Amino acid sequence: MTLLIQNVRCWNGGGFHTADVLLQGGKIKSLGTSISSDGVNALFDARGQYFLIPGFVDVHVHLREPGFSYKETIATGSGAAAAAGYTTVCAMPNLTPAPDTPAHLAEEQAIIDRDAKIQVLPFASITKGRKGSGELVDFEALSPKVVGFSDDGCGVQDEGLMREAMARCKALNKVISAHCEVNDLLNGGYIHDGAYCKAHGHRGMSSASEWKMIERDCRLASDTGCRYHVCHISTKESVEVIREAKKSGVPVTCETGPHYLVLCDEDLQEDGRFKMNPPLRSRSDRRSEERRVGK
C-alpha cells in the first residue's frame, strides 16, 4: 500500500515548508517537492492544512503498570501517546513493585516489550521502595536499562543521600529527575497555602516546600556535575531558582504541566477534581511559569 500526501506543511528544524510525502507500508519512503503520483494506491491533497513534524517526546508519564492497572496501563497510555503524535515517552517509577532492583525492573520491561505501542523508556527509583529516604538503589546494576532515576511522588529528604545519588549518576552519565518536596514544610496541607486556602479554612502547602529542595539540589548538581531535571514545577520561586542556576552553568532542566499554565488556586471552587500534587498555585505563580515556557 502506497500513499502520496501532497502539499503538507513539513518541519525542517527552522520552520515549516510545503512538500509531498510518499508512504509505503505505513512508513515514509521519500519526502520532497512534486513527487510523482504514478503507481500510488492512494492520493491525498493536504492543501497546506496538515502538518508533518518529528515525533514528540514526553519525559514524564505515568503508565502505572505493574501495580495500578486500574488507573492506566502501558498499552492504554502508550496508545494514547501514539494517537497524539508521541513516539517516545519516559515512564515514572511509581509502581508496585517499584523498579528498584533489576528483577523488579524486568517485570515492568516485560510488559513494555509485550504491550507498548511506541518507545517507552523506564525510570528506576532513586531509593529502595521509592520512599525518598533510607537506602539507595544499585545504580550501577540498573543504569544500562533505564533512561534515568527518579523517586517521583517523593522528594529525597536527606541531602547526603541525594549528593551520593548525584555523584553515582554523574559517573554513569544518567539524569536525576526529581520530585521536589520538603516534607517538613508541607504542614499537613493539601492545597496551596494562599488566599483561597486561608479564606476557606483549609490547610496549605507552602511554596517553600518545593523551591527549597530545588535550591538544595541545584547546589548539589553544581558540586557533582550531575544532570538534574526538576519535575512539574509550580511556583514562581522555583522558576527563578532554576533560571539563576542555569545562568551559573548548572546542568539543570525543568518541566511543568499544562494545568499549572492555565489554572490557579482561584479556580478550586471546593472541587476535589482540582486536587493534585504539587497543588495549583497562585495567579502570580501561573503567570511566572507562562512567561518562562521555552526559555
Predicted regions and their residues:
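N-terminal metal-binding scaffold of metallo-dependent hydrolase/deaminase domains
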Residues: 1-39, 50
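Divalent metal-coordination and catalytic microenvironments
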Residues: 8, 26, 49, 60, ...
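Metal-associated gating/positioning segment near the N- to mid-region
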Residues: 50-115
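Active-site mouth loops of central-metabolism enzymes
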Residues: 59-72, 121-134, 153, 202-208
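Short, acidic/polar
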Residues: 70-78, 130-140, 216
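Alpha-helix-loop-beta-strand connector modules within alpha/beta enzyme cores
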Residues: 102-119, 168-178
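Histidine/acidic residue-rich metal-binding segments in metalloenzymes
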Residues: 134-292
